[in-house]
Structure formats: structure tokens, C-alpha cells
């Protein structure tokens, strides 16, 4: 759903109205942080309204934006050229979001910024894709063998 500042209750209503066959729900680990206005996190509120628990990876690799983006890129095309992520042509929202994902321009002499720009619209689809892939296929710490010369 592409709406700015969508309240969790409205999101739940929209999802339930579509009558999706939901197997799992993946979300932002920050969704479990308590909101003072309701006394619970958005993930807890989502579960209370829909009955579906929100799966969030809490390890440092999955919480890292850069690691998560790298993980998604590996699904888009691995080093050997294999594509493991296929997006249906009817999913126009996520396609638009992926095409609109941007990074800040690098200025000579300044630090390179690794985090993407957040426009509050296109970044949500990309973030949700990252949460889903990191939740379903967790990032594993890679061990490399180094041969001595």
C-alpha cells in the first residue's frame, strides 16, 4: 500500500479487507519498540488486531541497513548470475519503489554515505522487501578461507 503516514489500524483494516491468505508476516525490528500513546509496539498492535505475529530478525546483521540491502541484491542477482528473486509484473508498487531507490550524491572530500535516501514513500516498499528476505532467509555471517602464499 502506498500511503504516507498510514496508521497501523488502517493498515490492518486494508489487509483484512483484501482477505489475503497470510502465511507469515515480516516486519521492522523497531516495530516492537513501545509507543507511549498506545503502550505497545506497532508489531504487538498488529498482532492484537489481526491475530498474525510479526516476525523480525533482531541480530546485528539483519538490523544493519547496509547488510540487508546487500542481502536483497544477492537475491536479485548472485555472483554467478543466478536470479533468485522474481517479482510479478502486477506488483507495480514494489517495481516503482525499487526503480526510485536512491543514495545521496557523493561530494568530493566528504564521507561516502551508505544509507539510502528516505523519502517516506518509495523507501517503505524496499524496506519491506528487505524485512521479508532477511526474515525468511536470515543473513549468515560469512566465513572465508584465506590461503597463505
State where each predicted segment sits.
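Mg2+-dependent endonuclease catalytic cores in nucleic-acid-processing enzymes, primarily RNase H-like
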Residues: 1-117, 137-140, 144-149
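Acidic, Mg2+-coordinating catalytic module of metal-dependent nucleases/exonucleases
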Residues: 117-140
Amino acid at each position: 500500500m502506498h500511503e504516507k503516514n498510514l496508521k497501523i489500524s488502517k493498515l490492518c483494516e486494508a489487509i483484512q479487507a483484501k482477505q489475503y491468505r497470510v502465511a507469515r508476516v515480516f516486519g521492522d525490528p523497531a516495530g516492537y519498540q513501545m509507543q507511549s500513546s498506545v503502550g505497545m509496539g506497532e508489531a504487538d498492535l498488529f498482532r492484537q488486531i489481526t491475530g498474525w505475529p510479526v516476525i523480525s530478525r533482531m541480530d546485528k546483521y539483519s538490523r544493519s541497513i547496509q547488510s540487508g540491502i546487500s542481502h536483497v541484491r544477492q537475491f536479485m542477482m548472485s555472483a554467478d548470475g543466478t536470479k533468485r528473486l522474481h517479482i510479478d509484473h502486477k506488483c507495480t508498487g514494489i517495481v516503482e519503489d525499487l526503480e526510485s531507490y536512491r543514495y545521496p550524491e557523493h561530494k568530493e572530500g566528504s564521507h561516502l554515505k551508505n544509507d539510502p535516501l528516505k523519502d517516506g514513500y518509495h523507501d517503505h516498499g524496499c524496506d519491506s522487501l528487505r524485512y521479508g528476505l532477511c526474515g525468511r532467509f536470515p543473513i549468515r555471517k560469512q566465513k572465508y578461507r584465506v590461503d597463505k602464499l
